[in-house]
Structures are given as structure tokens and as C-alpha cells.
């Protein structure tokens, strides 16, 4: 199994042809098949444009998709409560993705690190060249 969980933004950039992201995904495959949350699958498929369906479906067929189960939901709720107590709002989708990473010991691959102010998370160092 791959050690990486792809956030929705990474998947979208890849599917829209951002070569730097595609190269990064090729590099990550050396460690196994990356995964994504079922939530990311939903988010990406909601935004699919006409003509992108086949490529999108093919991409998801080659990822491990992690379900949002009871443990993931409970851990996400705990993260939201903990951060609310610190005056920080965590969005439900981000908390679910973060809890998936924490529970499965995965490294999150995202351009949106600011969405995940969670000390327990490990991030893959993603950069975009101008």
C-alpha cells in the first residue's frame, strides 16, 4: 500500500493536466499506489466537466479509496471539537481527510496546508513552480 493520501486539489490539478503535479504523482508511485478519501472522490466527481469523465474514472480506478467509516467520523469530530476549543474552525471535509490520514498513518499530499492546522498530520513537501 502507498503511504500517501492525495487531497482533492492535487487530484484536480493532475486531471486538468498540470505537468508538475503529474510528475510528482509518478514519483510517489515508487512507494506504492497512493490513496484518497471517498470524500475527495465525491468532491472531484462533482466538478467533472463534459469530456473529463473517462479520464477521471480511470484515475480513481487506480487509487486506493479510503472509506469514511465510524472511526474516521469519530476522530474527525474529535479534531473539530479540539480545534474549536482553541478558537480554530476546521471544516468537516478537511477534518474527515485529516482523520483518515491519522488513523491509517498516511502522509497528506495537498497544496492547502493551511486547511489542516493539525499537529498530528504529516505532509508531503509540495511546491509549485511559477
PLM regions: where:
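Short, well-structured N-terminal submotif of metal-dependent ribonuclease cores
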Residues: 1-36, 45-61, 129-130
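Acidic, PIN/NYN-like endoribonuclease modules and their adjacent C-terminal/linker elements
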Residues: 1-3, 98, 102-130
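Generic structural signal for small/hydrophobic residues in well-ordered secondary structure
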Residues: 7-8, 44, 76, 101
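Alpha-helix capping/helix-boundary segments
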Residues: 10-11, 40, 72, 96-97, ...
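A general structural signal for well-ordered alpha-helical segments in protein cores
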Residues: 21-22, 41, 53-56, 73-76, ...
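Structured helix-beta-strand junction loops
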Residues: 30-31, 62-63, 86, 104, ...
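General small-molecule cofactor/ligand-binding pocket signal
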Residues: 35, 66, 124-126
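Active-site neighborhoods of divalent-metal-dependent phosphate/nucleic-acid chemistry enzymes
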Residues: 65-111
Amino acid at each position: 500500500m502507498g503511504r500517501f493520501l492525495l487531497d482533492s486539489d492535487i487530484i484536480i490539478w493532475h486531471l486538468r493536466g498540470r505537468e508538475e503535479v503529474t510528475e510528482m504523482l509518478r514519483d510517489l508511485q515508487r512507494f506504492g499506489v497512493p490513496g484518497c478519501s471517498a470524500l475527495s472522490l465525491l468532491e472531484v466527481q462533482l466538478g467533472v466537466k463534459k469530456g473529463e469523465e473517462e479520464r477521471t474514472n480511470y484515475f480513481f480506478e487506480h487509487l486506493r479509496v479510503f472509506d469514511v467509516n465510524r472511526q474516521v467520523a469519530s476522530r474527525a469530530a474529535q479534531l473539530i471539537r479540539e480545534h474549536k476549543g482553541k478558537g480554530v474552525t476546521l471544516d468537516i471535509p478537511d477534518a474527515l481527510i485529516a482523520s483518515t490520514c491519522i488513523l491509517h498513518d498516511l502522509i497528506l499530499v495537498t497544496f492547502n496546508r493551511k486547511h489542516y492546522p493539525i499537529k498530528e498530520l504529516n505532509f508531503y513537501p509540495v511546491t509549485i513552480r511559477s
